C-alpha cells in the first residue's frame, strides 16, 4: 500500500523536544498536540493532567521520566515527536531518543538561559549530529531576557544561535513576536487561548532593531554557504530583493548541515508562539531524506554499506525502547531506516541472533494507541510480538542481514540491596526486576555471591526510587530497599598472565581443564574484551565459548572487593584438554580461576564514580560552598557569574555527595541549588581503598 501524500518521506519529521528540567518541554508538547488537533483539551503539568506524562509517578512529580512518542500532522507534514526527560538520572532516555531522531527542538527558559542539564543534552545531540532549532520559552516570566538567553547559547554551548524572531515585550507585557524572515508582527489573542493572532506591521519602536537583526541573520546565512554566490550578492547589494522562499531555503540548508541554530521565542503556557514553532519544524527541520544514507555493517560481505532511505529497499530498523504495556504486554519501539514493515512479518535480530514475528503494529500517542497494517521508511513504530529484542538491537530482513551502529549505555553509579517484604513476593519481585531491566539498560540487577542478596544499580537516587515505586504500582510487589551504596569498579594497572589447571578426581569420571591467559589494561572507558588466540586445537572449539563465559563471570566479581573488573583486555593464548575428563563446566570454572589468578598479579585498584557537580549560590555563600566541596575531596574546575549568582563547577566523588542537599540548604539559608551527573570513574586514594576492602 502506497503511503499517503502527507506521509511522503520529504514531508516526514522525526523530532525530539529536549531541555533542562522545568524549561517547559511537556507543556510545549501539550500545546503542539492541542493546536495540531491531537487533543481537544490542553493538559497542564501542574494539574497532573499532561497527556505526554502518562505514568503515575510523572503526574505526581511533574517531571517527565520516559520518552513518550506521539504523532501529529501539521500543514503538509507528519511529525513524530519524542518528549524526553530533563532530569539527569534519566539521561539514557535522551540518549536513545537522539539516536533515532532527525532533528530536535532545544527549549531554554528565558530567565535562566542555558542551565547545566541543557549543556549535557546539547553534548549528546552533538555526539549524534542531530540538527537543532532553539525555542526560548517562558517569555512571560519575571526576569525574562530573550537576548541574554541567546548570548548564553553562544557562550556556553558554542552554538551558532541566531534569532529568527524578535520578542514584542517581555514578562507580563509579552504580546507576541516579529518574524524576521517575513518582517511581520504576530500579536496573540489571550481570549482564544492563543489559537488566533493578528498579523500586523512591526511596532514602530521595534522597527530599527528588527532591521538590524534581519541584516545580521542574512549576513550569517550568506557566510554559511559561500558557494551560493547569487544569495551572497543579493545580501551585499540589495537584501530587500531576497524572497521569503530564498531565505527559508538558506535557513533550512544551514540547519540540515548542522551549521546554524535558528532561535524562536514564545510562552507555551500562555499559548504564544507554538504554532510558529511548528511552522519552523516543517520549514527548516530535515526529513529522513535530508539526513541521507545511514552506515551499516553487511554481515554477508563483512563490509560497511550505506542504507538509502527508501520504501523499496530491504527492511532495516533499530529497536530503541522497550516498554511493558498493561494491556498488550511488551512493546518494542523501532525506527525504520529503510524498507516497509508489514504486520505479520518475521524479522531477523542480528544483534541477538534468531527470527521473530511481529503480530501487531501500533502508532503511539503518549499512552494511547492506533492499530496499523504497515509502516514505512522513517517511521517510528511500536511492535508487539518481539520477545527477545532489547534496546540497541538491529532488526532486518534475512535477505540482507546487517548490523547498525550499536548504542552505548553509561555504567550505573549507585546501588542498593532489595528484598521482598514477604516470601510469597519473591517470584513477583524477580519478574518485576527482569521486566524493568529489559526496559532500562542503565538499570542492572545482580546477586551478591557472598550474602545472596539481590542488588539493584542505577544512575542516581531518584532513578532507583522511581523504579522501586513502579514495582509497587505496576507489578504489585512490596519490597524493602537498603541504603544507597556507591557502585565501585575494579581495574588492573599493569599487564600479567596466568597458567591455570582445574583438575578434580573423585572416583569415576574426573574434571580437567587447562587455560593460559595474558591480560592487560584497556583504554579508559572502552570496557572489557576477551579474545581467543588458540591455534592448532589445543583447546577444542566447543570449549572456547564456556572458557570465555567463565572469564566474563570472573570479570563480574573482581579480585579486591567483589566489584566488576572493567577496561581489561584478555587473550586466551594456550591450554590443554583431556579426551575423557574435559567438559564445558570444567573449562568455564578454569576460565574464571585463570582470570582471577592473572588479575591479582596486575596491581588491581578500585575505581569510584566521580560526579560533575554544578552549584548555583548567592555570592555571599560562595566561600562556604567551595570550602565544603574541597572537604568532600572535590576539585573546583571553574566558576562563573550569572544574574547575581555564582555557578561553581566541580568534580566530586559520589561517595562524598550523600546527604549533600540538606547540608547545602543549611550552608546557604536555603538559597543555593545544585545538579549533578555522572562524569567518569577514577582511582580511589589508597587509604580509602583499604577501608572499602575491609567493609
Swiss-Prot record:
It is found in: Cytoplasm. CDD domains: EF-G (cd01886), EFG_III (cd16262), EFG_mtEFG1_IV (cd01434), EFG_mtEFG_C (cd03713), EFG_mtEFG_II (cd04088). The keyword Endoplasmic reticulum does not apply. Its main location: cytoplasm. InterPro entries: EFG_II, EFG_III, EFG_III/V, EFG_IV, EFG_V, EFG_V-like, EFTu-like_2, G_TR_CS. GTP binds at residues 19-26, 83-87, 137-140. One of its GO terms (biological process) is ribosome disassembly. GO terms for cellular component: cytoplasm. The keyword GTP-binding applies. GO terms for molecular function: GTP binding; GTPase activity; translation elongation factor activity. Keywords: Cytoplasm, Elongation factor, GTP-binding, Nucleotide-binding, Protein biosynthesis. Residues 10-289 form the tr-type G domain. It comes from the Bacteria. PANTHER family: RIBOSOME-RELEASING FACTOR 2, MITOCHONDRIAL, TRANSLATION ELONGATION FACTOR G-RELATED. Belongs to the TRAFAC class translation factor GTPase superfamily. Classic translation factor GTPase family. EF-G/EF-2 subfamily. Catalyzes the GTP-dependent ribosomal translocation step during translation elongation. During this step, the ribosome changes from the pre-translocational (PRE) to the post-translocational (POST) state as the newly formed A-site-bound peptidyl-tRNA and P-site-bound deacylated tRNA move to the P and E sites, respectively. Catalyzes the coordinated movement of the two tRNA molecules, the mRNA and conformational changes in the ribosome. This is Elongation factor G. It comes from Protochlamydia amoebophila (strain UWE25).
Amino acid at each position: 500500500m502506497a503511503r499517503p501524500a502527507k506521509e511522503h518521506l520529504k514531508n516526514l519529521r522525526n523530532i525530539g523536544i529536549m531541555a533542562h528540567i522545568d524549561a517547559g518541554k511537556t507543556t510545549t508538547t501539550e500545546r503542539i498536540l492541542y493546536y495540531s488537533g491531537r487533543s481537544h483539551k490542553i493538559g497542564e503539568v501542574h494539574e497532573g493532567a499532561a497527556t505526554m506524562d502518562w505514568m503515575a509517578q510523572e503526574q505526581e512529580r511533574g517531571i517527565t521520566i520516559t520518552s513518550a512518542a506521539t504523532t501529529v500532522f501539521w500543514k503538509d507534514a507528519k511529525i513524530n515527536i519524542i518528549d524526553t526527560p530533563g532530569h539527569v538520572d534519566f539521561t539514557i532516555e535522551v540518549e536513545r531518543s537522539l539516536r533515532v531522531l532527525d532533528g530536535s527542538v532545544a527549549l531554554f527558559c528565558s530567565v535562566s538561559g542555558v542551565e547545566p542539564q541543557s549543556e549535557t543534552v546539547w553534548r549528546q545531540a552533538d555526539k549524534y549530529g542531530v540538527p537543532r532549532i532553539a525555542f526560548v520559552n517562558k517569555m512571560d516570566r519575571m526576569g525574562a531576557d530573550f537576548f541574554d538567553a541567546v548570548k548564553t547559547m553562544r557562550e556556553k554551548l558554542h552554538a551558532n544561535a541566531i534569532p529568527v524572531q524578535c520578542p514584542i515585550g517581555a514578562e507580563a507585557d509579552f504580546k507576541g513576536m516579529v518574524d524576521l524572515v517575513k518582517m511581520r508582527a504576530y500579536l496573540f489573542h489571550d481570549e482564544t487561548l492563543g489559537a488566533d493572532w493578528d498579523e500586523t506591521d512591526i511596532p514602530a519602536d521595534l522597527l530599527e532593531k528588527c532591521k538590524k537583526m534581519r541584516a545580521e541573520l542574512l549576513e550569517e546565512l550568506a557566510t554559511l554557504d559561500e558557494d551560493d554566490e547569487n544569495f551572497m550578492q543579493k545580501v551585499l547589494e540589495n537584501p530587500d530583493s531576497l524572497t521569503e522562499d530564498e531565505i527559508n531555503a538558506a535557513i533550512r540548508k544551514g540547519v540540515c548541515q548542522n551549521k546554524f541554530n535558528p532561535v524562536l521565542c514564545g510562552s507555551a503556557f500562555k499559548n504564544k508562539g507554538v504554532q510558529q514553532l511548528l511552522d519552523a519544524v516543517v520549514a527548516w527541520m530535515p526529513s529522513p531524506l535530508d539526513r541521507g544514507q545511514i552506515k551499516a555493517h553487511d554481515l554477508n560481505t563483512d563490509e560497511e554499506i550505506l542504507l538509502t532511505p527508501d520504501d523499496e529497499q530491504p527492511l532495516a530498523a533499530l529497536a530503541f525502547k522497550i516498554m511493558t504495556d498493561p494491556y498488550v504486554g511488551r512493546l518494542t519501539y523501532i525506527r525504520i531506516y529503510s524498507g516497509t514493515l508489514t504486520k505479520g512479518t518475521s524479522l531477523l535480530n542480528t544483534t541477538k541472533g534468531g527470527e521473530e514475528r511481529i503480530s501487531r503494529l501500533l502508532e503511539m500517542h503518549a499512552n494511547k494507541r492506533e492499530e496499523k497494517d504497515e509502516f514505512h521508511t522513517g517511521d517510528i513504530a511500536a511492535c508487539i510480538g518481539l520477545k527477545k529484542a532489547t534496546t540497541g538491537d538491529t532488526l532486518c530482513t534475512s535477505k540482507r542481514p546487517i548490523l547498525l551502529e550499536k548504542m552505548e549505555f553509561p555504567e550505573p553509579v549507585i546501588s542498593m540491596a532489595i528484598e521482598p517484604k514477604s516470601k510469597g513476593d519473591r517470584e513477583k519481585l524477580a519478574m518485576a526486576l527482569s521486566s524493568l531491566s529489559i526496559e532500562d539498560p542503565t538499570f542492572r540487577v545482580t546477586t551478591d555471591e557472598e550474602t545472596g542478596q539481590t542488588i539493584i544499580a542505577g544512575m542516581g537516587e531518584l532513578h532507583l526510587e522511581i523504579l522501586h515505586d513502579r514495582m509497587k504500582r505496576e507489578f504489585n510487589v512490596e519490597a524493602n530497599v537498603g541504603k544507597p551504596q556507591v557502585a565501585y569498579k575494579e581495574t588492573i594497572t599493569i599487564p600479567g598472565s596466568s597458567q591455570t589447571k582445574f583438575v578434580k578426581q573423585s572416583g569415576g569420571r574426573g574434571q580437567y581443564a587447562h587455560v593460559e591467559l595474558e591480560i592487560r589494561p584497556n583504554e579508559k572507558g572502552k570496557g572489557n574484551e576477551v579474545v581467543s588466540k588458540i591455534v592448532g586445537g589445543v583447546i577444542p572449539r566447543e570449549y572456547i565459548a564456556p572458557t570465555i563465559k567463565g572469564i566474563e563471570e570472573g570479570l563480574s566479581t573482581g579480585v579486591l572487593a567483589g566489584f566488576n573488573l572493567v577496561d581489561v583486555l584478555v587473550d586466551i593464548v594456550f591450554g590443554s584438554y583431556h579426551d575423557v575428563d574435559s567438559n564445558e563446566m570444567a573449562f568455564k570454572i578454569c576460565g574464571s580461576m585463570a582470570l582471577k589468578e592473572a588479575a591479582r598479579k596486575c596491581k588491581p585498584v578500585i575505581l569510584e564514580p566521580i560526579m560533575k557537580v554544578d552549584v548555583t549560590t548567592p555570592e555571599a555563600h560562595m566561600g562556604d560552598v567551595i570550602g565544603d566541596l574541597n572537604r568532600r575531596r572535590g576539585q573546583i574546575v571553574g566558576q562563573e557569574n550569572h544574574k547575581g549568582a555564582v555557578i561553581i563547577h566541580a568534580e566530586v566523588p559520589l561517595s562524598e555527595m550523600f546527604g549533600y542537599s540538606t547540608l547545602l540548604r543549611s550552608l546557604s539559608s536555603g538559597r543555593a541549588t545544585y545538579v549533578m551527573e555522572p562524569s567518569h570513574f577514577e582511582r580511589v586514594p589508597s587509604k580509602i581503598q583499604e577501608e572499602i576492602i575491609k567493609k
